[in-house]
């Protein structure tokens, strides 16, 4: 049996992985790196002593009258995808918000290839899930008029 030593996963290594995906990382002084895309912001937080967390908030909110449809969509998406997982919650104004989350499993460290692959998978899967939500719940305000 052989062993492989792997380095701890740090904010710098995650930042390099975001760059390797071809995105510009935005690094905060709170231990987070973000990839900011048109209408999408995907963050990875690296809290000291805790697993890294990938998070993204869907940029739209839903009226409470759509709660059953949202709950059904959340169940279907979570049942059909490994990552990220999506949850719904109620905002202070009563609207329904959707939150995407993934906990990275790098307890004993990871190789550069592993970090890059998992960061890439999370970013691409989060964008794909948000695109699915866009298809399931079209935004009537973004449609072009017939005379546009």
Protein language model regions, located:
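Long, continuous compositionally biased terminal/linker segments
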Residues: 38-68
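A short acidic/glycine-rich loop-to-helix N-cap element
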Residues: 106-120
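A generic structural signal for beta-strand entry/edge sites
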Residues: 30-32, 49-53, 93-99
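Charge-rich, low-complexity N-terminal segments
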Residues: 1-45, 89
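Short, highly charged C-terminal tails/helix-capping segments
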Residues: 134-148
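Amphipathic alpha-helical hairpins
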Residues: 37, 92-93, 148
């Amino acid at each position: 049996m052989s062993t492989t030593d792997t380095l701890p996963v740090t904010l710098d290594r995650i930042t390099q992985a975001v760059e390797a995906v071809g995105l510009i990382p935005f690094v905060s002084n709170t231990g987070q790196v973000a990839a900011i895309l048109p209408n999408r912001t995907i963050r990875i937080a690296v809290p000291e002593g805790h697993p890294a967390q990938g998070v993204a908030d869907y940029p739209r909110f839903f009226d409470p009258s759509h709660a059953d449809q949202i709950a059904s969509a959340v169940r279907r998406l979570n049942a059909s995808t490994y990552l990220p997982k999506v949850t719904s919650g109620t905002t202070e104004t009563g609207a329904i918000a959707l939150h995407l989350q993934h906990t990275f499993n790098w307890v004993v460290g990871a190789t550069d290839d592993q970090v890059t692959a998992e960061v890439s998978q999370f970013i691409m899967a989060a964008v794909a899930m948000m695109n699915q939500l866009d298809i399931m719940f079209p935004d009537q305000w973004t449609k072009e008029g017939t005379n546009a």
